[in-house]
């Protein structure tokens, strides 16, 4: 069910962000920090997207804290004094406090008390992924905005990275492998240059995901 599936997923993300937090402190290199950024952003997106499984108020608070970490990490990566800024930021007690709080909450049964906690995990993932596909396609076709495009693409890519195999849908596999696997910004120009083909694939994927509607 959603309760068990989501708990396992959050443990996985938490283990990853802690690993790259430690690695960033040890190595002080941008590659480790980019990975740390990826998982902080993943946690923000997942906690804010799937809060129907969780205590809504608490998950929203945690999501905003990971959003703040994401923003600060992006600023450091763009800074000329990135090494010094990185150490000050990652050594901040606020991050350790957040990790301690998060570690506590994901182990607590009361954290998983959302309205949909007893539904099937696969169904909830499919519905959320379909929603992201529809919104992303709408943005490309009707109301293109670069910042919104980048944000909605990343949200879609995050869910595909973790769940495209889990849902066993060929069009999702194709969507991930061809367009969402690389985190390079060049992928945006590839999508725009192949907009019609890409949007057709999004439409097919959305249609495939309807089988989980229930």
Labelled PLM ranges:
Residues 1-214:
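Function-determining surface determinants
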């Amino acid at each position: 069910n959603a309760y068990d599936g989501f708990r396992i997923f959050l443990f996985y993300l938490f283990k990853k962000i802690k690993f790259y937090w430690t690695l960033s402190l040890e190595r002080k290199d941008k590659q480790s920090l980019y990975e740390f950024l990826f998982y902080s952003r993943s946690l923000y997106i997942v906690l804010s997207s799937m809060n129907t499984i969780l205590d809504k108020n608490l998950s929203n608070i945690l999501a905003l804290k990971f959003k703040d970490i994401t923003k600060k990490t992006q600023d450091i990566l763009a800074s000329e004094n990135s090494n010094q800024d990185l150490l000050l930021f990652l050594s901040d007690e606020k991050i350790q406090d957040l990790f301690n709080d998060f570690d506590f909450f994901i182990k607590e049964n009361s954290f998983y008390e959302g309205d949909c906690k007893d539904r099937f995990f696969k169904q909830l993932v499919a519905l959320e992924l379909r929603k992201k596909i529809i919104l992303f396609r709408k943005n490309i076709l009707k109301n293109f905005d670069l910042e919104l495009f980048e944000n909605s693409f990343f949200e879609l890519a995050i869910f595909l990275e973790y769940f495209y195999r889990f849902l066993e849908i060929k069009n999702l596999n194709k969507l991930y492998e061809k367009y969402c696997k690389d985190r390079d910004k060049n992928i945006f120009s590839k999508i725009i240059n192949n907009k019609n083909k890409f949007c057709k694939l999004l439409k097919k994927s959305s249609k495939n995901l309807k089988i989980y509607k229930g």
